[in-house]
């Protein structure tokens, strides 16, 4: 499981209803942030009885209320596909991650295949309008534009529709 890589003090950005919380290592110390108070209430219920220490925080993930370098690991799952431009939030992840810490990202992205990629480009306008989902993001480019260093990148799922990236704050 991808989130087993998380260590130290962990920030989950866009925690939603807490679906990831059971997958963090036992004994983890997690700050779970989301803009939606309703989602956080559901996350609190889901977290009951888990072997992790969780603090919930209502916050805008692009303007976090934490000092620089406050977390060893920052993570997000399927959050940035809902943003037209995730670069400011990626910069914020870099800011609150300690030097030498890790940034874990999992999102759906554009499939880089001759027919599928252009089809996704055509469908993107509709998916943004109907569901608020940007299906043509190129996360590698966004991560680099935010000044972060990519340590590992894996395409997952059917034709690589998902991308898992491990990054760290730039030097």
Name each model feature, range by range:
Residues 164-171:
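C-terminal lobe and adjacent flexible extensions of AdoMet/dcAdoMet transferase-like proteins
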Residues 29, 100-102:
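Short glycine-centered segments of the SAM/dcSAM-binding site in methyltransferase folds
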Residues 87-99:
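A short glycine-rich, Lys/Arg-flanked "PGG" loop and its adjoining helix->strand segment in the class I
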Residues 72-85:
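A short SAM/SAH-binding and catalytic strip from SAM-dependent methyltransferases
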Residues 62-74:
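A short acidic, Gly/Pro-enriched loop at the edge of an enzyme's catalytic core
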Residues 9-63:
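Class I SAM-dependent methyltransferase SAM/SAH-binding core
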Residues 91, 104-162:
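C-terminal alpha-helical "lid/dimerization" subdomain adjacent to the S-adenosyl-L-methionine
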């Amino acid at each position: 499981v991808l989130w087993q890589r998380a260590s130290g003090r962990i920030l989950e950005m866009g925690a939603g209803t807490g679906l990831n919380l059971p997958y963090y290592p036992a004994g983890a110390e997690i700050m779970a942030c989301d803009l939606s108070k309703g989602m956080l209430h559901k996350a609190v219920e889901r977290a009951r009885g888990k072997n992790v220490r969780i603090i919930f925080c209502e916050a805008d993930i692009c303007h976090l209320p934490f000092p620089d370098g406050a977390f060893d690991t920052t993570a997000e799952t399927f959050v940035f596909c809902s943003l037209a431009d995730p670069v400011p939030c990626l910069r914020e992840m870099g800011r609150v991650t300690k030097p030498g810490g890790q940034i874990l990202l999992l999102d759906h992205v554009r499939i880089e295949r001759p027919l599928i990629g252009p089809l996704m480009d055509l469908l993107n306008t509709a998916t943004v309008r109907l569901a608020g989902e940007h299906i043509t993001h190129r996360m590698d480019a966004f991560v680099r534009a935010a000044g972060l260093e990519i340590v590992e990148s894996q395409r997952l799922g059917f034709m690589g529709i998902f991308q898992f990236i491990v990054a760290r704050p730039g030097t």
